[in-house]
Every structure is written in C-alpha cells, then in structure tokens.
C-alpha cells in the first residue's frame, strides 16, 4: 500500500507540474498553481493509493468495485476545469442543464487532458492523443454542446498543428473572450445535450 501511495503521489504531482507549465504558457498562473489540489485530500488520495495502476485513473477501479467513485464525486465538485462541475438548473423550470464553461476553465480543461495523455502514454504520446481520447470517450454525454464544440475544435487544432499553435490560439482568441465557434463557423450539435431531471 505504501509503495502504491508513493507512486500515486508522484503521478499526480507530475501531472500537476505538466498542467502548471502549460497553464503558465497561456497566462493562467493562478489556475496553474492551484490545479487539482483536491487530489491531495484524504477523500481522493486514499482511493489513488488503494487502486493505483499507473495506466489509468484509480477512480475507474473504485467505480467498478462500488458502482460509483467517491473520489470523483469529491473531485468534480471542487474543480472548475471539469465540465461535470458546470451543471445547474434553470430558474423557473428547475430543470438541470449542462452550462457552457467559461473560457479560462475550458483552457484549463484542455491542459488537463493533454497532461493526462502525456502521463499515461509516456514516450508514445503524440499531439493526436487528446483528440482521439475525446472522440472515443463515453463520459462526455453530459457536456454542454458549445463546450463540446469548442473542446473538439481546440484538440483538433492540437492534433493538426501542434502545441505551439494551440497555445497561441488559446491566448489570442479563447482567453480574450472571443466567440471561437462564430469565428470558425462551427455550429454546435445541440442534439447531444442530455435531458436532466427536475430539481
């Protein structure tokens, strides 16, 4: 258990440092410094120590064993770079909806996904990996349609033109508040937005 705990500590710290470096590259200094600090809390860290594999998130193992992941529920409610954080109900209807992520957290989500692929793929990592992971992911059904379209565009840009081009685009267009979907002529697919129950 101690060996797993130490390896988990090294993995999450390495991940944080990669995200920090990427966030700093686009000017997100505070977010770079505070990224994923909740992973060091006992609620999240103990799960990592117990289920650590080094090839994927320990939350997957906890979910398979318990039917849910307490660590993930704790994490997503405290970290705004996860699209799952951005769910609330509409005033009047009280129907839960997926909200569009603010630009700074969309950018941090991109950095988080890049770093995760770099950590888990190691020397085999390519700039296509985050885009391919998104395309094959089954856990994005509750993402806001505009957020999904923006994320897809940015990770596709990474796959086609590389990190330098993507980071420059984030600095010049995303973090300035520009509507990148209008800029690029992208129409979000609202048919993928999920129905939520009433509050």
Spans of features found by a protein language model:
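Metal-dependent phosphohydrolase cores
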Residues: 1-199
